């Protein structure tokens, strides 16, 4: 399995509602995405920091999603609204507690070489 994490820091508080709305729309459609196994989201710092952790069958499934028209539109529409850091790693099994713990280590700077806000 392949895990991908997005750590997005929104520049202006006025952009928080539109970023949150789009994130909820995305989450509702998640079961329809080929190769997507899991998605967890978190909102921190009063909503300014949005984190998503997604689990995929393979890196190729993630690449196909990243190249999809819907994802490309979202990246274009929100490019200037915040700063995005991404990281990825392999997971042996779909274990929510373990994967979230690995994500937390990255978010808190406990994994060398992984940028975070």
Each model region followed by its residue ranges:
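Short S/T/G/P-rich N-terminal loop/turn motif that feeds into the first structured element of a domain
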Residues: 1-49, 61-64, 84-117
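Short hydrophobic/aromatic beta-strand micro-patches
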Residues: 9, 53-56
């Amino acid at each position: 399995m392949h895990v991908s994490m997005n750590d997005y820091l929104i520049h202006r508080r006025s952009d928080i509602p539109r970023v949150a709305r789009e994130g909820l729309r995305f989450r509702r459609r998640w079961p329809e995405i080929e190769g997507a196994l899991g998605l967890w989201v978190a909102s921190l710092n009063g909503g300014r920091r949005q984190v998503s952790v997604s689990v995929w069958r393979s890196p190729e499934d993630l690449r196909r999603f990243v190249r999809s028209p819907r994802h490309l539109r979202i990246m274009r529409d929100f490019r200037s609204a915040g700063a995005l850091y991404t990281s990825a790693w392999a997971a042996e099994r779909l274990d929510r507690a373990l994967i979230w713990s690995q994500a937390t280590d990255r978010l808190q700077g406990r994994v060398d070489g992984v940028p975070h806000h």
